[in-house]
């Protein structure tokens, strides 16, 4: 059966007739009139899956895209589920600067208001961590953040936190997990047509928690001077809050001018993710021009944070997520952190060693901050994909803005001592033992290739890697781990969001990583 043959024209027409947005309704009707089965099949490939990351898709017409109809029905399902648990649910709502974000925020607020909830609406174009902070600080029962984080420009999304009377203890203010996600998805499926969902402005309250957020984040460090920071928001929403925080703490801040203002088209980068090759080129150029001590880069919704530093040879080097995680963990431990450190299982084992060195607890969790943030008595958590949580009491999620001030403080400490962040990292290796990491990713067009690769891993794992026998194989819900006699570790798992097979390589000998990668390429044959 062809893709075109699966189009239900009556369903698409009914959707368009009940779409509250005349533009997307008109688009669907145009496709119907033209007989454009390819576009219709893509737009009606099934409802957007409401998972633990909420929703994320391209902005456009139809049930499979991000649009007003989808946001309205999703919010109806969410508030219906919340009302099963509490009376008059209180929901904080934030949004970034992507296409459609402000409208989606207004729609969500009006649905919550009409359903008997109370909507706390944050100023538009602000970081995701501000919404997460607001859920905890104002004891909201839930939080909605309209964002697609570092996705391509065409996308938007809808992220949900639970708190207040719904989630308490370590889970307060954290992204939802199963079974709540499935229960909310069921409620969304039962929602009426979008234009039949009541809207109201009666119970909408504008709230602004930026001052409280800045007060809290500023307490993470003391006042510093004599450190110059090049800061880029990657065309996202982090510049204003980040610059205020860093300046307040005494740092000299210079924004990368081409990337300072929010722009949903992200014109200077091919992909708005600080991890991507070339994404920091403008930032590094600016850092060199102003003689910066460090370059700090937020991703578009500022929940993640990358750093680059000058080397002894005069070039600049971007720190990996694992390197930054080790530096932050060591710094926070030396500043008197108590409780537990945590990182995802695909992140380096180095944080566990650092925690043990300072007498702190350590937990290894499944991938995703929804699991890291649930660690009891959490003092610091991170994932290798440049996500860091330096103040979990305030923000139980990744927080690029708060992370940036801790990184800046660490840079100031190093400068005052006549050393560098890279030298500090070597000092950590000397104290607890070196571990170096490297990613290896296989992108495929056919998802069956990934399934075959994972079957091979389960049935016949590699006998050796870079000449060292594989001594142990451990399976976990998302994949497998290999350990060699040399204490190398390889983790293999499918990507949860893209058609990729992801491998995470770690070794006490950096020179072995390329050889391990070569052996894995030969092993998988992809």
What are these regions (language model features)?
Residues 3-108, 114-115, 203-227, 237:
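An N-terminal, well-structured beta->alpha segment
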Residues 15-19, 23, 37-48, 156-287:
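Gly/Ser/Thr-enriched, mixed-charge loops and adjacent short helices
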Residues 44-64, 148-151, 233-241, 245, ...:
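Conserved phosphate/anionic-ligand binding catalytic regions in large, soluble enzymes, centered on
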Residues 92-155, 245-307:
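N-terminal small/polar loop signature for handling phosphorylated ligands or for N-terminal nucleophile
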Residues 102-107, 132-136, 154-162, 196-197, ...:
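Short acidic, glycine/serine/threonine-rich loops at helix termini
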Residues 288, 292-294, 298, 315-317, ...:
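Phosphate-binding and adjacent anionic-ligand microenvironments
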């Amino acid at each position: 059966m062809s893709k075109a043959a699966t189009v239900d024209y009556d369903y698409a027409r009914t959707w368009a007739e009940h779409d509250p947005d005349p533009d997307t309704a008109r688009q669907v009707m145009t496709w119907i009139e033209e007989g454009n089965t390819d576009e219709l099949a893509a737009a009606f490939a099934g409802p957007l899956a409401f998972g633990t990351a909420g929703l994320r898709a391209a902005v456009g017409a139809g049930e499979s895209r991000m649009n007003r109809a989808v946001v309205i029905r999703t919010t109806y399902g969410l508030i219906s589920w919340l009302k099963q648990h509490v009376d008059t649910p209180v929901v904080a709502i934030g949004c970034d600067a992507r296409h459609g974000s402000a409208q989606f925020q207004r729609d969500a607020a009006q649905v919550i208001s009409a359903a008997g909830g109370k909507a706390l609406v944050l100023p538009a174009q602000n970081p995701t961590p501000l919404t997460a902070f607001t859920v905890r600080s104002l004891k909201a029962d839930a939080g909605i953040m309209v964002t697609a984080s570092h996705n391509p420009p065409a996308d938007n999304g809808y992220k949900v936190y639970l708190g207040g009377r719904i989630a308490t203890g370590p889970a307060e203010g954290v992204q939802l997990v199963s079974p709540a996600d499935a229960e909310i998805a069921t409620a969304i499926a039962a929602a009426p047509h979008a234009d039949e969902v009541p809207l109201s402005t009666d119970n909408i309250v504008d709230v602004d928690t930026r001052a409280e957020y800045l007060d809290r984040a500023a307490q993470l460090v003391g006042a510093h001077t004599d450190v110059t920071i090049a800061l880029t928001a990657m065309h996202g929403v982090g510049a204003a809050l980040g610059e205020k925080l860093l300046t307040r703490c005494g740092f000299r801040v210079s924004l990368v001018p081409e990337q300072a203002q929010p722009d949903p088209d992200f014109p200077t980068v091919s992909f708005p993710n600080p991890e991507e090759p070339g994404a920091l080129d403008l930032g590094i150029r600016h850092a060199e021009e102003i003689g910066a001590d460090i370059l700090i880069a937020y991703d578009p919704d500022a929940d993640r944070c990358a750093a680059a530093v000058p080397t002894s040879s005069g070039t600049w080097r971007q720190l990996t997520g694992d390197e930054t995680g080790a530096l932050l963990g060591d710094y926070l431990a030396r500043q008197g952190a108590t409780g537990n450190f945590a990182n995802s299982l695909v992140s380096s084992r180095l944080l566990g060693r650092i925690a043990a060195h300072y007498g702190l607890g350590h937990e290894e969790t499944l991938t995703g901050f929804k699991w890291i943030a649930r660690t009891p008595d959490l003092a610091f958590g991170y994932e290798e994909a440049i996500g860091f949580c330096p103040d979990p009491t305030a923000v139980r999620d990744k927080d690029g803005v708060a992370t940036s001030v801790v990184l800046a403080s660490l840079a100031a400490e190093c400068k005052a001592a006549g050393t560098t962040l890279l030298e500090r990292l070597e000092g950590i290796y000397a104290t607890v033992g070196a571990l170096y990491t490297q990613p290896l990713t296989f992108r495929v067009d056919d998802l069956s290739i990934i399934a075959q690769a994972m079957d091979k891993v389960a049935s016949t794992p590699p006998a050796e890697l870079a000449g060292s026998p594989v001594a142990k194989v451990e399976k976990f819900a998302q994949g497998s781990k290999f350990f060699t006699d040399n204490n190398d570790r390889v983790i293999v798992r499918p990507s949860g969001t893209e058609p990729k097979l992801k491998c995470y390589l770690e070794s006490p000998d950096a020179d072995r990583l390329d050889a391990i990668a070569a052996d894995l390429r030969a092993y998988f044959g992809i």
